[in-house]
């Protein structure tokens, strides 16, 4: 088992990574939100089962959660325990941050992607109509409990897709960790407990370091977490890839863009593509001409756009990055780097 703490505006969050964690050691007066089908994590605790996926982040479901909390007598001494994937953790964060102006929150992510991404950061949101994450809060959990035993039944494709975020942390923030991931790809795919524990632990350490410096996205430092996501989001929406698969494709496109701008050696682009492939991730995708056009057009609506430019975090060498102002047209070209015409 590994653990660390990070500081933020609300105090300190404890992060624990291991197998067979005893959740009762970390919560008092627990009330649980859990995805349907998961085993009850805390026997005897009031539990509301919810469907997973983006649909859970609605005002209708949020109202249901508020009603549940009121019904079971939740107050400022209650701990809301969120058990599930990233979407449910987002909803729970918003609910905990707004119910009675804030109650204690503990995250128990049950997918690898949620462990290395959504569980840490303090972002909570619900969608409004077709607009994702329109209504949100920053609200840090008191504890994040990454119990690797949840991953045993995770489908292979879903499991592999999370490694795009792990590679991202190494590429952008820690060259030594990037090398470690490259050397341990086989162990990670084999779900080796020791390798997986370190990968999750180090990924969260690196993300926590960013959050400590730029908790509320006011200093630009948190932009590094968007490496691969500018192109990735466009590809994800048009082609229906899993989030991690789209981020992998987006990383290759943005690394190539960095190389064309003279920041990154071409050999680093090729190496990163090999690392992603070794983890079972795509580095390019077949697309029709219409899909190519749709994905290229979508980057124009990126939230980081300012006028005719988009501010994109670019890797300049493993472990180092810069925030660069890129013409929208250049980003559209980057989309075409990784979408092969066909189909």
From Swiss-Prot:
Domain of life of the source: Archaea
CC annotations in GO: cytoplasm
Cofactor details (free text): Binds 1 divalent metal cation per subunit. Can use either Co(2+) or Zn(2+).
A single GO BP: aromatic amino acid family biosynthetic process
Subcellular compartments: Cytoplasm
Known function: Catalyzes the conversion of 3-deoxy-D-arabino-heptulosonate 7-phosphate (DAHP) to dehydroquinate (DHQ).
Family label: Belongs to the sugar phosphate cyclases superfamily. Dehydroquinate synthase family.
Name by which UniProt lists this protein: 3-dehydroquinate synthase
């Amino acid at each position: 088992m590994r653990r660390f703490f990070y500081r933020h505006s609300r105090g300190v969050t404890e992060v624990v990574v291991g197998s067979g964690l005893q959740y009762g050691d970390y919560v008092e007066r627990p009330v649980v939100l859990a995805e349907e089908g998961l085993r009850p994590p805390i026997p005897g605790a009031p539990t509301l089962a919810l469907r997973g996926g983006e649909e859970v982040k609605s005002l209708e479901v949020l109202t249901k959660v508020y009603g549940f909390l009121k019904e079971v007598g939740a107050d400022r001494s209650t701990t809301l325990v969120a058990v599930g994937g990233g979407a449910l953790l987002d909803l729970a964060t918003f609910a905990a941050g707004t119910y009675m102006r804030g109650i204690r929150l503990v995250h128990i992510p049950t997918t690898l992607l949620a462990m290395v991404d959504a569980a840490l950061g303090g972002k909570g949101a619900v969608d409004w109509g077709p607009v994702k994450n329109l209504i949100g809060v920053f609200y840090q959990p008191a504890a994040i409990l990454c119990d690797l035993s949840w991953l045993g039944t995770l489908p292979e494709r879903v499991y592999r897709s999370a490694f795009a975020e792990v590679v991202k942390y190494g590429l952008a923030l820690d060259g030594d960790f990037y090398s470690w991931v490259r050397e341990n790809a086989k162990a990670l795919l084999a779900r080796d407990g020791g390798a997986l524990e370190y990968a999750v632990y180090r990924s969260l350490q690196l993300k926590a370091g960013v959050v400590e410096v730029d908790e509320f996205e006011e200093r630009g430092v948190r932009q590094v977490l968007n490496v691969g996501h500018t192109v990735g989001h466009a590809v994800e929406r048009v082609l229906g890839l899993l989030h991690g698969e789209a981020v992998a494709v987006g990383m290759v496109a943005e690394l190539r863009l960095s190389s064309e701008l003279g920041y990154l050696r071409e050999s680093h682009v090729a190496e990163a593509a090999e690392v992603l492939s070794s983890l079972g991730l795509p580095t390019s995708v077949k697309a029709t001409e219409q899909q190519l056009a749709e994905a290229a057009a979508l980057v124009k609506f990126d939230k980081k756009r300012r006028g005719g430019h988009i501010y994109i975090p670019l890797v300049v060498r493993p472990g180092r990055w810069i925030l660069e102002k890129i013409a929208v047209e250049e980003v559209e070209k980057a989309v075409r780097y990784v979408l092969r015409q066909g189909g």
